[in-house]
Amino acid sequence: MEWHDEGLIIGLRRYGETGAILEVFTPAHGRHFGLVRGGFGRRLRALLQPGNQADFTWRARLDQQLGLLAVEPTKLMTTRLFASGLALQGMNLIAALLRLLPERDPHPELYAVVRVLLEHLDEPAVAPILLARFELAMLTETGFGLDLSACAATGATQELIYVSPKSGRAVSARAGAPYHDKLLGLPPFFLDGSLLKNPTLEEVEAGFALTGHFLMRDLFGPRGQTLPDARHAFLAETAKTYPRVAPQCF
């Protein structure tokens, strides 16, 4: 068995004296593990850090085996990530979220989103918005996507400012007003056509409150887990670094 693919390193742990088990995320083969001989040695370890991108070749006698990974780094992100607390915690959060995916299950569209996100992780005005949208995409990819297309009560497609915490469907301002305290806020940047607006910090935090509710209810909670520590750390960095007046997002 053999495959070749590009991808992102999301985890590394020692195996034996100098070997390493590498966890990667690729477009065609999803989240995948493989043994890298000498991967924990002095020469390779620095190249195999989470966030770095590479071309991978995986080989095994049988498909269900761990297999061997050959790694050809294509883009090293370690220095850039460690220079920014926001970027470092963002990468840790991305890795934690990707571990919700079944092993070897391809998610090419999600991989494309991650590639864009990595390019902006150290940008305080952009990274939180993109990461919140990534969490929204994770819910969709795992079968728990929200329906933000129309009001659950009236069918209206305008003034959608709430989401039902039970159904995951959008609710309009008028229909949701009597239940304001029981509904989750829906920030404009989660809706199509609103990417050019400048979200406030409060809107960004509302976005993470929304995705966090459903991530906990549908994904982390059933596994007996809590939301990742990296998520709390990323939100703390966001609160410190997010500009009061954000530049144009895309």
Curated annotation (Swiss-Prot):
Q: Which residues form a coiled coil?
A: none
This protein's GO cellular component annotations are: bacterial nucleoid
Q: Does the keyword RNA-binding apply?
A: no
Q: Does the keyword field hold DNA damage?
A: yes
Which keywords does this chain's UniProt record carry?
DNA damage, DNA recombination, DNA repair
Q: Record's Pfam families?
A: RecO_C (PF02565), RecO_N (PF11967)
Any one biological process term the GO annotation gives: double-strand break repair
Listed NCBIfam families? reco (TIGR00613)
Into which family does the record put it?
A: Belongs to the RecO family.
The free-text function statement in the UniProt record for this protein reads: Involved in DNA repair and RecF pathway recombination.
This protein is called DNA repair protein RecO
Designated gene of the protein: recO
